Amino acid sequence: MIYSRSRLPSEGEILIATVKQVFDYGSYVTLDEYGGLQAFLPWSEVSSKWVKNIRDVLKENRKVVVKVIRVDRRKGTVDVSLKKVTDDERRKKNLQWKKIQRLDKILELVSQQLKLSEKDAWEQVAWKLEAKYGDPISAIERAVKEGEKILIDAGVPEIWIKPLLEEAAKHTEEKKVKMSGLITVKTSEPLGVQKIKEVISKALENIEQDYESILNVKIYTIGAPRYRVDVVGTNPKDASEALNQIISNLIKIGKEENVDISVVKK
């Protein structure tokens, strides 16, 4: 379980949330980095574009990246926005989330070995490393390569150091795999470039959340009308499935938006 130093998030914070209930007027989500704290996502904050049915955008149990827009510390309530998260913020958060999950797994296993609580692990290891270096998992990876001094300098208690380094060595960054596909994209619509960008953006929604091993996805022109789709991850099967899903999304959404998309090579 992931533990946060604070009971409530701060306004402007970018977080991972799990959609729990979807209503006509909005959705209740839980904030994964705050112990499953419930937050409200208003209908007006779901999309910057007109959406006929909120369930076309939000599906229960799906993870989404949200921005905190209101916090009432007296009542303990939080409101979040989906539409205020930029593509760059979403990409960075998904990468950070994968690191947090890896950190959580390491701390869970080490705390079990020591017969201590996971909260102890977060307080005595993760928070100390965060205070000293900013990114706990990167600090642990450095310690595996450079030695225990990295942990000692951050004030990590001695009891944690040896088992932490041993366990972390088993969870070092996995070898990356890359899957690519070529497509052609054509449209006779006015403002065609903007229309193509919108189709690509929609096609990529939730891909990195749906496939946990996916690290990065890029779609870019290699000379109009040809585009390359690159999927980078740590699991070949997931990377292949994600590539197929993206291309399928592109073709489907392209038809809806009068953008002709065809596969050249996968």
From Swiss-Prot:
Pfam families: EIF_2_alpha (PF07541), S1 (PF00575). It comes from the Archaea. The keyword Protein biosynthesis applies. This is Translation initiation factor 2 subunit alpha. The gene is eif2a. InterPro entries: NA-bd_OB-fold (IPR012340), S1_domain (IPR003029), S1_IF2_alpha (IPR044126), TIF2_asu_arc (IPR022964), TIF2_asu_C (IPR024055), TIF2_asu_middle_sf (IPR024054), TIF_2_asu (IPR011488). It comes from Saccharolobus islandicus (strain M.14.25 / Kamchatka #1) (Sulfolobus islandicus). One of its GO terms (molecular function) is translation initiation factor activity. The lineage of its organism: Archaea, Thermoproteota, Thermoprotei, Sulfolobales, Sulfolobaceae. Keywords: Initiation factor, Protein biosynthesis, RNA-binding. Residues 12-83 form the S1 motif domain.
